[in-house]
Design a protein with these regions (language model features):
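Class I (Rossmann-like) S-adenosyl-L-methionine-dependent methyltransferase catalytic domain
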Residues: 1-56, 60-114, 132-139, 143, ...
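A short acidic, Gly/Pro-enriched loop at the edge of an enzyme's catalytic core
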Residues: 113-123
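Conserved acidic functional residues
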Residues: 70, 117, 127
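A short SAM/SAH-binding and catalytic strip from SAM-dependent methyltransferases
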Residues: 122-135
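Compositionally biased regions
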Residues: 6, 119, 146-150
């Protein structure tokens, strides 16, 4: 528990430093890459994000961090930015203060306070589940089911420890396509597609209820 807390605090501090370094920049890439310029991230953006943005729909982003993916999601009717760390939500709010359709939600680890049941058309998370311990991922999968509509699209990036770059990253959790696939199915979702090759340390899964 203590080690997990220290890791969370370290990640928060790194994110806040990255925020402050980039506040004057027009585009947020942070130290993890800019989806406008890094080819694998551009692919994720163009296949798993932009086709689903719809001004009639509601969306959730889990762990928005510096807003590098949030900027592509602001076209939804309502976007719920969900994070455990209030400091990060505060920074994100300053960056997107002109966007009245963003709701900032501080959760308790794997819940969605204030988001109505069966109200979400699209849920996205990138750069967050790669760090989560597997029991938290399973808790999220249970909670997500209650807020999404039937037929909603859920897109999650997660750690793939079968890849050498994930093995070398001590901050990445113990996960793999086999484990993630089994967990998604155990939570009674239908897997639509997976991408296990585009990213050098992780994978992406899209599923629905």
């Amino acid at each position: 528990m203590l080690a997990h807390s220290k890791r969370d605090n370290s990640l928060t501090k790194r994110l806040l430093r990255a925020f402050r370094r980039g506040l004057s920049r027009p585009t947020y890439g942070l130290e993890w890459g800019d989806p406008d310029t890094v080819e694998p991230l551009k692919f994720i953006r163009d296949r798993y994000v932009l086709p689903y943005v719809d001004a009639r729909h509601n969306a959730v982003e889990i762990g928005p961090g510096g807003g590098r993916w949030t900027r592509y999601l602001v076209g939804f009717r309502t976007l719920y930015a969900v994070d455990y760390h209030q400091e990060l939500l505060d920074e994100l709010g300053r960056n997107f203060r002109c966007r009245s359709n963003i709701r900032f939600v501080r959760n308790n680890g794997a819940d969605f306070p204030g988001i109505a049941a069966s109200s979400i058309d699209y849920l996205f998370s990138f750069g967050t589940f790669v760090h989560l311990e597997f029991h938290l991922i399973e808790s999220y999968l249970t909670s997500i089911r209650s807020i999404i509509k039937p037929g909603a699209n859920v897109v999650i990036q997660y750690s793939d420890k079968t890849k050498i770059m994930a093995q070398l990253n001590k901050g990445f959790s113990d996960n793999s396509p086999v484990k993630m696939r089994d967990a998604v199915r155990a939570a009674d979702y239908n897997i639509i597609e997976e991408d296990t090759t585009s990213l050098w340390h992780s994978a992406v899964i899209r599923f629905t209820r």
